[in-house]
């Protein structure tokens, strides 16, 4: 596991312990069972792809460990509406505070402002976080294979599926891909960013795509800035894209989203 992931896991487990002390698991699970109705994250993507269109998971992200502050003018509801107007299929909202200046409240506010399904983008280490995500309205969670062993990944996936949620499995290399393919979820994100070095190359997606079975929906993640990047990934069968930084840096987010999708189509 990389140094950055080790650091993140340490503070995440402290966060989880504090959250459990404040809100016991039974309480959060009850809230999850009575959360707002699911919107169907994977279904929204499948429907878009069925119409022969690219599917965009548009990300609301204030900052990152590698780039620092990305957007000072940060208004999650306004950004969510801008993405929806620009043609996004789903939203991804960073909820990690120490590394990304995110918050669960940002996800709640973004989801309330649109009709789009929402991914809680965070580092998941405990099924408690799954309950917490659903209790706050999330339709999908992220599992980073580099951060978890197989048993933990399986338990977290099962908790999400039991609640009717979707799961995006994220991989960066062949061993992680092989592990992810043993799980049930069909959404498979290929992260072009190396979480150890922060180097980003679309060649990662190009190298792994051929090993992904046809029943999986590949999602290109990181390093996607232009229609040419989308076209490059589309050539290896990737038609769903998670894009954050390049759109977050634009003054007119709706126009930038629309342009990215229009020129890529």
From Swiss-Prot:
Amino-acid biosynthesis as UniProt keyword: yes
Superkingdom assignment: Bacteria
Its EC number(s): 4.1.1.48
The protein's name: Indole-3-glycerol phosphate synthase
UniProt keyword Amino-acid biosynthesis present: yes
PROSITE patterns xrefs: IGPS (PS00614)
Enzyme class: lyase
GO molecular function terms listed in the Swiss-Prot or TrEMBL record: indole-3-glycerol-phosphate synthase activity; phosphoribosylanthranilate isomerase activity
Pathway(s) it belongs to: Amino-acid biosynthesis; L-tryptophan biosynthesis; L-tryptophan from chorismate: step 4/5
Keywords per UniProt: Amino-acid biosynthesis, Aromatic amino acid biosynthesis, Decarboxylase, Lyase, Tryptophan biosynthesis
PANTHER family for this protein: INDOLE-3-GLYCEROL-PHOSPHATE SYNTHASE, TRYPTOPHAN BIOSYNTHESIS PROTEIN
Classification of source organism: Bacteria, Pseudomonadati, Pseudomonadota, Alphaproteobacteria, Hyphomicrobiales
Reactions listed under catalytic activity: 1-(2-carboxyphenylamino)-1-deoxy-D-ribulose 5-phosphate + H(+) = (1S,2R)-1-C-(indol-3-yl)glycerol 3-phosphate + CO2 + H2O
Pfam families: IGPS
UniProt similarity note: Belongs to the TrpC family.
SUPFAM superfamilies linked: Ribulose-phoshate binding barrel (SSF51366)
GO terms for biological process, alphabetical: L-tryptophan biosynthetic process
